[in-house]
A protein has these predicted regions:
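A short, acidic/glycine-rich surface segment
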Residues: 63, 85-89, 121-122
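Solvent-exposed, amphipathic alpha-helical segments
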Residues: 7-18
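Short solvent-exposed loop/turn micro-motifs enriched in small/polar/acidic residues
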Residues: 10, 60-62, 93-95
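A solvent-exposed, acidic/Ser-Thr-rich amphipathic alpha-helical stretch
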Residues: 4-6, 21-76
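Low-complexity, intrinsically disordered terminal/linker segments enriched in charged
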Residues: 110-133
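Exposed beta-sheet edge and beta->alpha loop/turn motif
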Residues: 81-108, 113
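Basic/polar N-terminal segments that are highly enriched at the extreme N-terminus
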Residues: 1-6, 129-133
């Protein structure tokens, strides 16, 4: 398991760097072929499409890996914070969240379920990071 853990830590660091490269194909390369993600309980979508949408919405997107939690069931929780400036509203956001990963035998992400506080995200899109409604 120690070797697997190191490989997953390396995967998480590379995944974070891929998001910061603002290259959706690089993000998708960390998933099995046809990799999917579901965000906030929504329908699954192709990771490349989800990454492309976030990169378009936040052209200066930065993702920071906050922590990794290796669970008893074999899944991994990748905790992150993303920052960026909305291309639409011009407001800056700083949103923490996490993804629950299932890792495939080949060491890539087989499935991801991502979560963040949608209400706080929406508030920041309208009013910025430090402003209140």
């Amino acid at each position: 398991m120690a070797r697997d853990r190191r490989q997953i830590e390396q995967l998480a660091r590379a995944y974070t760097e891929a998001w910061c490269s603002r290259d959706s194909a690089r993000v998708a390369a960390h998933y099995v072929a046809g990799g999917m993600i579901a965000v906030n309980g929504g329908d699954e979508a192709a990771i490349a499409e989800v990454a492309e949408a976030f990169i378009a919405a936040f052209p200066d997107i930065e993702v920071f890996m906050d922590d990794l939690d290796f669970r008893q069931d074999g899944s991994v929780e990748y905790r992150w914070t993303f920052t960026g400036t909305s291309a639409e509203s011009g407001e800056s956001v700083r949103v923490p969240g996490y993804e629950e990963w299932t890792i495939a035998p080949n060491g890539l992400i087989a499935q991801s379920r991502g979560y963040y506080d949608q209400a706080e995200y929406d508030r920041q899109l309208q009013h910025g990071i430090d402003q209140t409604t």
